[in-house]
């Protein structure tokens, strides 16, 4: 029996969840969101564990709390609100800003070590942004409904500013006709 590291274990669970959801197309949309959220939290935990716990020696309980909070907040705001209305790069940049602020506050308040919270938050947010880019591609392909995305884009792009143009700069008035 071999021992797997966190990345191998997460990859296998992600592949199994993707295979399970593709075989069972009768699963509701809620199950797809639960699988996506669980995968996001698991990978966020694995990534933050490597960076914050192994590199910066933060406690595992703090890392787990940060990963759970960040996973829920970024899934609801970045993946469900920003991504369907914009594109992948914009949503990834929004996730970078959100994760950087959340990580900076949590690392500053939850850890008691002699490292720079700014550097730890910046490195963690940058690594999470790379993951978010590929996670957004997965969401767009497998989780978000095509009708939902089309409905949002049609509703958001309804403002069309147009200008009227006239043949004359000065309109004819009754006084000009009398002369």
UniProtKB/Swiss-Prot annotation:
Q: Which gene encodes it?
A: yndM
Give GO cellular component annotations, separated by semicolons. plasma membrane
InterPro entries recorded: DUF2512
Chief subcellular location equals membrane
Its name, as the record gives it, is Uncharacterized membrane protein YndM
Q: Does the keyword Glycoprotein apply?
A: no
Q: Give membrane topology per the record.
A: Multi-pass membrane protein
* Keywords in alphabetical order: Cell membrane, Membrane, Transmembrane, Transmembrane helix
Q: Where do the TM regions start and end?
A: 33-53, 63-83, 89-109, 115-135
* Nucleus keyword on record: no
Q: Give its localization.
A: Cell membrane
